[in-house]
Amino acid sequence: VTAPSYVNGILDQLRSRHPDIYQMLLYVEQPFPYDLEKNQIDVHSVSARKPLFMDESAHDWRLVRLGRQLGWSGVALKTCKTQTGALLTLCWAKAHGMDLMVQDLTNPMLAQIPHVLLAAHAGTIMGVETNAMQFYPDASLPEQDVHPGLYRRRDGSVELSTISGPGFGYHLGGIRRELPPPVVSVGA
């Protein structure tokens, strides 16, 4: 989709034909091409109807800046695209009044911890998207033994009370994960 009028038409029809559903719609996510630099589409008319979130386009805070200039009103943060990148984008977006969400591309095992910690402190529109337990339910069993509430959803929520201390609160000493032997050893 490259025409804001197309997205606006869908939203306008939804608002007139099904106003209850339109009211429940929290946001629109990345309906336009991912490469913002090549596709500099003015989307202010869409974000005037519903919050418009960058997702795949938001892999660098400078692209988030460009997106905001084009009319995007929110950004999806993903620690799987680097923790530092997510933090830089978070800071820039917050400083410029953009809405935030934290999503994953399936963060199992230890990756789940910084992911949910970012969401807990970011001020998102509604919690965190975390789907590793859905797609890879057994991948995080060693971590789940130490952080049970983090790897099991209850009533749509995860629980972070076991995360504390240094190193993102991993508690690595208690996690019994067997790793394969290293491929390369330096200085052995």
Tell what function each PLM region has:
Residues 1-105, 110-112:
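Catalytic core of soluble alpha/beta enzymes
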Residues 105-188:
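Flexible C-terminal active-site loop/helix
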